[in-house]
Structures are given as structure tokens and as C-alpha cells.
UniProtKB/Swiss-Prot annotation:
It comes from the Bacteria. It is found in: Cytoplasm, Cytosol. May act as an export chaperone for the filament capping protein FliD. The lineage of its organism: Bacteria, Bacillati, Bacillota, Bacilli, Bacillales. This is Flagellar protein FliT.
């Protein structure tokens, strides 16, 4: 029973931590914290599986864990979407910057070319 309480505490902390997504330089530390919390949670879950943990719908703690797990999955998806959006914006910025420095790199015009035909 001790591990289920520990899992509940770690899951609640993770759910709370996933509540707001920081911007900029703070995001790297934020993601590292998420990874460490997920690793802790994973080790606790593996320990529970080795003990032969059985889910009981009548148990209040088990239902709370299930609800927290659903919320964690939703918030993790939101974090992933935010990171994907930032990566897409970064790629767009890089492309715009490259286009600014060399505006004629993608132009494929054959103007000014001629073929010298010698018999």
C-alpha cells in the first residue's frame, strides 16, 4: 500500500507541474523536471507490477490514480504540441533568414543562357 501512496503523490506532483508551460530558456529545465518525474513514476509502477498489483474500481485511491493518469496524458500532449509548434516556428525563422541573406538561391531561370551550336 505504501507504493500506491507514493505513486499517488508523484502523479499529483507531475500533474501540478504540467499545469503551466513556460516559454524560452525555462523550458529546458521544465522538460528535464518532467523527465525525472516520469522516471520516478515508471520505477514505482514497475515495482507495483512486480508485486502483482491489481486495479480495483471500488478503491478511491485507484480511481484517483486513473483520473490523474488521464490528466497527465492530456497535459503531456499539450506540452508536446507546444514544443512541436516552437520547432516549426524555428524552422520557419531559419528559412526566412536564409531567404533574406540569399534571395536568389531558389530561382531557376534560364535567362541569359544560350547554346553555341558548332557544326
Amino acid at each position: 500500500m505504501y507504493q500506491t501512496d507514493q505513486l499517488l503523490q508523484v502523479s499529483a506532483n507531475l500533474f501540478k507541474h504540467l499545469g503551466d508551460i513556460p516559454n524560452g530558456e525555462e523550458r529546458d529545465e521544465y522538460i528535464e523536471t518532467i523527465n525525472t518525474m516520469l522516471d520516478k513514476r515508471e520505477t514505482i509502477i514497475k515495482g507495483l507490477k512486480q508485486e502483482g498489483f491489481q486495479f480495483d474500481e471500488q478503491n478511491r485511491i485507484h480511481r484517483t490514480l486513473l483520473e490523474l493518469d488521464k490528466g497527465i496524458k492530456q497535459r503531456l500532449a499539450a506540452v508536446m504540441d507546444a514544443v512541436k509548434q516552437d520547432m516549426a516556428n524555428l524552422q520557419k525563422t531559419k528559412k526566412s533568414e536564409q531567404q533574406y541573406f540569399n534571395p536568389y538561391s531558389n530561382v531557376r531561370v534560364m535567362d541569359g543562357m544560350y547554346y553555341d551550336k558548332k557544326n
